[in-house]
């Protein structure tokens, strides 16, 4: 595996987010999903619509999320949509709960433990995914960020339970 290029900025604004996106040199094409964590109701651990809105609109993106596997305000589609509304994400884009109508398995390549991930069926509807993640400490894994957002973040409720149980 080659070395990754990492882009950093001290300026955290909608404009700096667009600058970093443009620096990648890979324009979003087709149906664009923007994977974020919409956060738990009453919490503050999510990227705010005011920060990501300009980028999401620029790429004509749909925010994509999956329901959680634990108790909270995102463990059912109905509750999740209410949380999304209260956090203001419907004000900037369409939102798709990608496991709302079921899930399917995708293989994990070059694996050590899990043979597959279980993701929402709507994930098939997207040609291009932009992953926007906040960096945080996580009670179970120690750290959370882009890789977690792209693996367990696109996993359906069943997929999240599968991953957290180490595939058992």
Model-derived segments and spans:
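N-terminal and secondary-structure boundary signal
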Residues: 1-168
């Amino acid at each position: 595996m080659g070395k990754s290029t990492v882009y950093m900025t001290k300026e955290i604004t909608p404009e700096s987010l667009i600058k970093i996106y443009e620096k990648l040199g890979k324009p979003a094409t087709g149906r664009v999903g923007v994977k974020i964590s919409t956060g738990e109701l009453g919490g503050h651990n999510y990227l705010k619509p005011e920060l990501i809105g300009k980028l999401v609109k620029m790429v004509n993106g749909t925010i994509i999320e999956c329901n959680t596997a634990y108790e909270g305000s995102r463990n059912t589609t109905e509750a999740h949509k209410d949380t999304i509304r209260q956090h203001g994400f419907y004000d900037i884009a369409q939102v798709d709960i990608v496991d709302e109508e079921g899930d399917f398995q995708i293989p994990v390549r070059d694996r050590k433990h899990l043979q597959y991930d279980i993701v929402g069926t709507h994930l098939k509807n997207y040609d291009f995914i932009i992953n926007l993640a906040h960096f945080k400490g996580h009670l179970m894994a120690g750290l959370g960020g882009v890789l977690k957002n792209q693996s367990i973040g696109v996993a359906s409720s069943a997929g999240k339970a599968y991953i957290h149980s180490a595939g058992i």
